[in-house]
């Protein structure tokens, strides 16, 4: 207790493990004819994928036995229009997308309930009225401090909030029905791009530009890796010389032959030696081909599972110096700390200016800041980077209802929290292991 208030509970620190996968990207430089063939293959497989996804949503949740039977039947049916390997990738991706949709509905329900709880607590009060003092009001289930709730500033604001509360309740009912029925709402190509079609006047796209983006986002050019096969993938293969070969679906063999070979060789820059070692060892490598219509560029992504080193124990990391990091809206404040938590040397400020930038630019700025943190940790021989888990995911669920209006109320949303995902259920310290050379 401090002045009658319950302080925020500090959670136990956890060590974030190293990533268990690798993904690298390079450009493809196809000719006009090869680009046309890639588009035709992607559009055909995309159409098949969307049809299978719609059918899978209609089946609702399946147990293990029923799912195995469904996938075997669909793979056999799809082989006639694609190939056995394309059919395997499509059915696997369909199931992954369905499960992701179900998890998204469950997460959406949790966010709606949190927002409704906040609105209900304030809407029951008259404008300007203070909630009565109650022991249950001092702290919530997450252990955070809670002030006495106050009613909204005016009757007009309260009326607006009651309308929003009714809308959220309606959305919650719809989401709960979708979850119970096992029918998530999935938009292949992205709901944001779909909404842009209905509001083109508010975007910088013409209808033709939107159509190109929409068609590109709905293509399917994903091939799962196969261990023991040449190059680690028989569907999309890249050999040691960089020659890219794509297996043509059965429905397009008459036009493009059994395989489409890209004339210009491809080359990976980042982690190229690891990729080459897997190709030579015939280890599984997954490939994804995508198209950016705004730039007119084709991209090839290679991904595979990695074998990270065991996560070190927390006591082991505490033995040496660590780099403590404080997250702020426009910068990261870092300082080297000894084993007792005392600062060593001068603190460092790393600017992270993301206001007004596109999502891709914001992501680049945050990645650059993380790279500087890793470099600083390496220069100071720090065993780990320690950053507080501020639990911004929970704040975003109820922030519109609790943080108030204007720039002051929304200042907390400027912190680059997506780059520092929470690893625990409650606020606390998140310890990141420093990996030399990782970016």
Locate predicted features:
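Nucleic-acid substrate recognition interfaces
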Residues: 1-439
């Amino acid at each position: 207790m401090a002045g009658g208030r319950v302080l925020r509970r500090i959670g136990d620190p956890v060590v974030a493990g190293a990533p268990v996968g690798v993904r690298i990207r390079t450009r493809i430089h196809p000719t006009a004819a090869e680009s046309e063939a890639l588009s035709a293959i992607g559009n055909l497989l995309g159409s098949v994928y969307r049809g299978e996804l719609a059918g899978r949503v209609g089946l609702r949740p399946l147990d293990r036995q029923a799912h195995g039977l469904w996938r075997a039947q669909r793979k056999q049916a799809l082989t006639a229009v694609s190939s056995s390997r394309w059919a395997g990738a499509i059915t696997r991706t369909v199931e992954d997308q369905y499960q992701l949709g179900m998890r998204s509905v469950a997460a959406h329900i949790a966010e709606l309930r949190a927002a409704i709880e906040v609105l209900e607590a304030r809407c029951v009060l008259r404008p300007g009225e203070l909630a009565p003092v109650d022991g249950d009001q001092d702290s919530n289930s997450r252990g955070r401090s809670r002030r006495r709730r106050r009613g909204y500033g005016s009757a007009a604001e309260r009326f607006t909030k009651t309308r929003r509360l009714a809308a959220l309740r309606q959305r919650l009912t719809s989401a709960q029905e979708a979850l119970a029925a096992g029918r998530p709402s999935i938009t292949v190509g992205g709901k944001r791009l779909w909404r842009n079609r209905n509001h083109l006047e508010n975007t910088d796209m013409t209808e033709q530009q939107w159509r190109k983006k929409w068609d590109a986002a709905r293509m399917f050019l994903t091939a799962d890796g196969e261990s023991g096969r040449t190059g680690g993938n028989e569907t999309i293969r890249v050999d040691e010389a960089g020659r890219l070969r794509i297996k043509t679906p059965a429905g397009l063999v008459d036009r493009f032959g059994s395989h489409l070979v890209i004339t210009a060789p491809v080359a990976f820059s980042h982690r190229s030696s690891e990729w080459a070692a897997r190709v030579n060892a015939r280890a599984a490598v997954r490939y994804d081909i995508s198209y950016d219509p705004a730039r007119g560029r084709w991209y090839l992504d290679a991904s595979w599972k990695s074998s990270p080193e065991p996560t070190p124990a927390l006591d082991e990391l505490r033995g040496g110096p660590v780099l403590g990091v404080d997250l702020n809206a426009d910068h990261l404040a870092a300082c080297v700390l000894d084993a007792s938590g005392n600062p060593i040397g001068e603190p460092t400020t790393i600017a992270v200016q993301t206001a007004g930038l596109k999502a891709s630019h914001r992501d680049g700025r945050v990645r650059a800041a993380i790279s500087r943190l890793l470099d600083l940790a390496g220069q100071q021989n720090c065993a780990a980077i320690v950053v507080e888990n501020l639990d911004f995911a929970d704040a975003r669920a109820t922030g519109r209802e609790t943080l108030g209006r204007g720039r002051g109320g929304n200042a907390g949303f400027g912190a680059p929290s997506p780059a520092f995902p929470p690893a625990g259920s409650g606020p606390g310290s998140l310890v990141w292991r420093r990996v030399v050379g990782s970016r």
